Amino acid sequence: MSFLNSSRRRTRSPSPGQIFAPSATPIVIDSSPSVPSASSILDSLLGEFSEARDPYTVEAGPTGRSSDHLFSSPGVLTQSPGRENVPPRPSERTKDAHGKDRFLVSTERNGRSPFRGNPYRSAEIHSPKGRLKAPTKEGGTRKTKKFSSSNRTLTGRSTKFLAKTASKPTQSSKVPSEIPAAKLDSLQWEDGELRLELATTRRGSWTPIKDTSIDIVDPTRNLSPSNVSAAGSQKFSSMLSDYGFTKGSTLTMENELRREVPTTKRRLELLQGTANDIFSEGDFSRPPEKSVVNPNGTHSRRSRKTTSTTITSLSTAQYGHQDSRQMSNLADFFPSGEAVERPSGAIKKLKTSKSGTKKKGVKKAKEAPLFKVASIEDALKSLEDQVCLFGTSSQLERVSSDEEPQMANFNLNAQFPRKNSRPQKTRSPCSNPKTSKSLWYASSRGYDDIEFVDMIDSSNPKTLESVEASTFVTPIDSSPMHSQVASQMVFENPCDVSHVLTKIPQTGPKDPIENPVCPEIQIRHSGNVKTQSTSGQSIPSFRGLTTAQLAQKVASFGFKPLRSREKMISLLEKCWESQQQTHIPAMLPASHTALPDSVTRAEQMSKRDTIKSRDIRASKSRSNSNHIPGLVSSTSQNTGYAAKSPDCIRGSSKSNDIGTTQGSPLLTTQSVIVIPDSDDSDNDNNPTGGAYSYPSLASNTPSSSTRTMASESLLSVRTRYEANVGEEQGSNDINQQITKAIRAQPRLVAINGVKRPTWLEKILMYDPIVLDDLTVWLNTEGLDQIGEDSEVSGTTVREWCESKGICCTWKKKRHVAP
């Protein structure tokens, strides 16, 4: 302890009074770091146990002097060597007036406390409230830096801006000489004037003047790095070229996009406005464009063409690089001639260059077809050829030809011939059109609820005249009588044949055996005579056809093609047999659709009124046969052809008057006798009398079973046809009355806020019409509103709905009685 005390007394620092005492000897402050003394180490050990005191108070020593080494440290002190009594503060560095770094109070120098290790640094510390003030040095000159006001900085913060301004006092005040001091003092803004001139000069005094000169860029010149000198102008020109404001930058931008970005979508190009730039000759002759399209370039520029094998490649194939071709097609619609012609030549050059890389032998590539907008006249002509189909979705059909749209309006009324309403090209109910039929046709039924079945081969459709000629025409005798009449019987238009019958010669063979066959007069538009017998037809050989032809034949009969070839052949044979048995009675009503001439009808009416009984009519028919004495009856021969009796002549004359108006031949099958209908049925159903009475057929001689069945079926068809023709005019009137009644129905009153639509409103809204309800309404209210005292049946209402294209249905599935 004695050693420590002696060393402490030996190294004790002098008091502040001794340091700053006036002396002639200059004091040199040692700036080199020194080793900490033992006293400082001891104070650091003892300072940890001392109480907290004010660090700026000075205690008096035993001699009564102030001792700076007894400063009490604050409550929290640092524990590092040399900083025991210094409160922890961040080290703040500042610069003095000479630009040298200088630490503030918290800095440590020479490894000692600023108060104890280096007492001379206490002069730089300005304590608050003037506790420790460093006295100024008076006396001789010192070599050290002077303690001036510029060196005395506060301990709070460090401001570098003040140090810089202190070192440069001349640059901070620049007031122009043009503004006098008196004028600056009088700058007051109460008068409301802005004084822009003074404000501009004041702003110029402290704001540096910038270079506001604008670079003028010529958009017509070729902007390249060699031509542009300034870096700013290059950047500005590149911005212009990116937006396509110059001529030379459009194609270069396209080339860069094609080389770098492999796009998969079509890029939109401007045609109007920049069309002259795009389609100019200079653009297509530039080296950048040739370098892209010309095959002499690198192979990496051209896209590799591969076959599309995936759905994605197939869907994106249309977005390829075909901009030039598409622009040429679009340019054709513009009126400018040069702008349209030049792209085609350029595109042709591009195509030949591309095709030359693929095939060396090909020199020219085919040009793309030019698509042009059709004129207004052509568009109107195409609209005239279109056929509009109206109806519900269940009534419209699929058509593939120009004639088949007429089948869309097909209904049950077409199943039965009407007076003066059947056109020449209208098909019979058993005809089979080439294309698919409508849904109404597929399930069409007659009045007796019998479904119509189509068994006719549609591969070679026969007309009405050809079927009748091939079925019912008998061979013409080569007698002189027919040679005189044949040339006079051919005429163009249907007309009365009464004057033709008068030209038949009155002379003929007296012996009935000499002329066993009754000749048949054939009247045709073409004048050609065809002789064919029904019995002479044989089953065609279906085995010689291919499978595809067999399937087509089966489909023509309305059946689906079968897998087995044998089954299709057997099915075709059955269909052919049924066709030969059914086409004779089915085609017969179609030959009597037209009315006879008025003169012939009046003559037959007068004859019909004079006949009262069957015997009288038979005797009168025999007596009337005297005007053609050359035609007599005879027995049947082995050839299968039967001769006509005088009764046959009478029946033939009637059928001739009726049938020849359509240009069809007379019908002769075998020896027949006249069996007219009863008077009651004719008077009730047929107002025109005997004009529609057809003789029935009966066999007097033995014949085959096939002819007997044909005769019976022909009789039944004729009987049904007479009844239908009698009701034809009445059905037309009923349809008109139903239409008037539905349109005349008044609007119904709503019940409990629920509207009740009329029948017309239901039809217009495509609501299914219940036939039972509509029939009841027509019979109770509808027909009475228009003054019609009659009733309609459900079948009649159904026929009317289908003729108008109205969707109808029954309330319950039931069998409709005929």
Swiss-Prot record:
GO molecular function, one term: 5'-flap endonuclease activity
One Gene Ontology cellular component annotation held by this UniProt entry: Slx1-Slx4 complex
Single Gene Ontology BP annotation: DNA recombination
Residue intervals passing through the bilayer: none
Organism: Uncinocarpus reesii (strain UAMH 1704)
Keywords: DNA damage, DNA recombination, DNA repair, Nucleus, Phosphoprotein
Keyword hit for Phosphoprotein: yes
Protein name per Swiss-Prot or TrEMBL: Structure-specific endonuclease subunit SLX4
Superkingdom in the source lineage: Eukaryota
Subcellular location: Nucleus
Family assignment from sequence similarity: Belongs to the SLX4 family.
Region (Disordered), start-end ranges: 1-39, 53-151, 279-324, 413-437, 587-712
HAMAP family xref list: Endonuc_su_Slx4 (MF_03110)
